[in-house]
Amino acid sequence: MSQFRTRALASVAAAASLSLLLAACGGGEDSDSAAKPTEATKGKVTLEFWSWTDGIEAQTKVWNKEHPETQIKFVNAAGDTAYQKLRAAVNAGTAPCLSKMDGMNLANFAADGLLTDITDVAGQYKGKYTAAAWNAVSPGGTTFGIPMGSSPLFTAYRADLFEKYGIEAPKTWDDLIAAGKKAQKKNKKVKIFNMAGEDPSTLVDLSWESGAQWYKAEDDHWVVDFTSPEALKAGDIVQQLVDNDLASNASYADPGVFKTWDLGTTIAMTTSTWQLPIYNTNFPKSKGKWQLADSPMFDTAKPQTSSNFDTLGVLKGCKYPDRAAEFAAWLSSSKESLTTLTDPASKSGLFPAVTDVSPYVDKIIPTEMFNGESDSAKVITDAASWVGDQWQYGPNYAAMYSEMQKQWGKVMKKEITVKEMLTSIEKWTVDDLNDKGIKAVAGS
């Protein structure tokens, strides 16, 4: 089980490049210019805020009690059509000032001219967050929101079955392949990993960790590169898992998916913080038999992980972007807010994107699930500090990912190879961007 992530170029030149890129897709003229405080921001204001994360509304009430000059009107926007509703609201001129969104959608909204450039007013908060997290809200160096949460990648494995099969927690992806083969010599039915037929996020994780850059903003165009040496190195690991039948293909849409791990059919997974409470509830037979370890690496001397990021985007038309940024920074970085939101009792599933996560780690670890023989807190803290900052979402990432999902299923069925899929996706992505009037070239 895994996730997604992003990276942006932080230089002034890159910021200018993004402006050209946004203009190429219709976002440049419509996007609000860099936000600056106005006379209206000096008095009492009310901002509308959309989110669908448990526990957030309660924190909004705490803020409102302490900040009478900036009142937040919370709207629970839960539902499968939240992003469509946001787009419609922006186009109708009725959008909230602030909304939850993942990094992928923040980049897409920015490219479509649906967000406000808050670079000037948000810079004061940058130091509170990791570089990778800030990149997630600053595609091309232009800031459109504030980081909210992260989900750094690490490994969970069945320590009892690893011992039974004579294998150790893999330090590298090659180690994972070798461990899977060794385990199958003792049990032909066991799988070292799971890759759902509908979910190519494993490839995203591997590509991020390998140093690949599927998208890169460069001058006035996008460079699209799914077939770089780094990308193909990541793809090769997936191909080996498929060719050697080392991975199960349990669907994450199936409520019974947890049984593949709980019953020991699959004995390891890459995972993250928000998923831990879910396992604690759904692994009744294997409680106390699990252990955490670092995610397998491509280069242990230069550890690099991946992480999806939740963000708080400032929508086009927001009249008080400085107040929106102030509230967002308080919600996502203050000790007062994070102490509550990172408590499992809040049910938020939030893990911070701040530079120092150590105060919030211990309480998210379900003690009944793990055998206590590894330093779970250190594993999580290290994973958070190792997230690579080269990853960048492109303007059509969401559409690209949907296309990849279609081809990923064919890879899992051995109908096409990973390399064939990556080659096809690269061409599809370049063509799609150019068809939309966004200049793009293939990188390889």
Model-derived regions: residue spans:
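C-terminal lobe and pocket-closing loops
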Residues: W274-S286, D299-E403, A440-S444
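Short amphipathic alpha-helical coupling segments at ligand-binding clamshell hinges
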Residues: Q59, E230-I237, K319-L331, M421
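Hinge/lid segment of periplasmic solute-binding proteins
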Residues: G103-L153, D205-S207, Q291-A293, A377-V379, ...
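Glycine-centered hinge/linker elements that transmit conformational signals in sensory
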Residues: H221-A250, S295
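Conserved C-terminal helix/tail region of periplasmic/extracytoplasmic solute-binding proteins
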Residues: E163, T381-S444
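A structural signal for short loop-to-beta-strand junctions that line the ligand-binding cleft
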Residues: A88-A89, P96-C97, K126-L161, K191, ...
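Conserved N-terminal structural module of periplasmic/extracytoplasmic solute-binding proteins
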Residues: S2-N108, G123-Y125, A250, D299, ...
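Extracytoplasmic/periplasmic solute-binding protein
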Residues: T142-M148, L153, I177-V224, E230, ...
